Amino acid sequence: MPFRVEFDPSECVACGTCAVACMDQCDTVIGVDVPCRRIVTLEDHSGGKTVIRYASVGCMHCRDPICQRVCRQGCYTVDAETGLVLLNGAACVGCGACVKACPIGAVALNSAGKASKCNGCRERLLLGLPAACERACQNQAIRFTAVESGAEDDRETVTLLSRLLGSGKGGRAC
């Protein structure tokens, strides 16, 4: 059954446990590898006062992924079983088109100059286990939710994150 990634910024307290769990799950080497999840502090200065919010940023596994559309090498596929957007890093030539296209900055080039992103803990989900970031989040700000085929898409969450991040990418949704 396909999964949808949901993120609720009102529940994120920037504790970082999701990012650490992700790094542990993926055997990320700090200072060498690009973490698949990062915590971002967001400041809103509108309305005469400063409001601080946080966002845990990682691949949202969009239903119609722009990274897949812009990749000329065909490195991205949507897994038929889980709906996760998977990356074949070995086929990547490091052009960076996907990095520039992602509206929330969830794709990065690693130290080898190849694209890198969250794999959604596919193997965990197939075993009926939560993704590492979801398991670690005490406030349940991150959820991988099983959805029926054709269920509502993820554009609302991606657009919200894009707007909150102020990425200068026009608030595009996947």
Model feature map: region roles:
Residues 61-84:
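Ordered, amphipathic secondary-structure segments that act as subunit-interaction surfaces
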Residues 31-61, 68-69, 89-174:
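Flanking helices and flexible, charged tails adjoining ferredoxin-like Fe-S electron-transfer domains
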Residues 1-11, 16, 21-42, 46-47:
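N-terminal cysteine/histidine-rich coordination modules
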Residues 18, 22, 71, 102:
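The canonical Cys-X-X-Cys-His
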Residues 10-13, 17, 66, 93, ...:
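A generic structural signal for alpha-helix starts
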Residues 3-5, 55, 83:
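Short amphipathic alpha-helical segments
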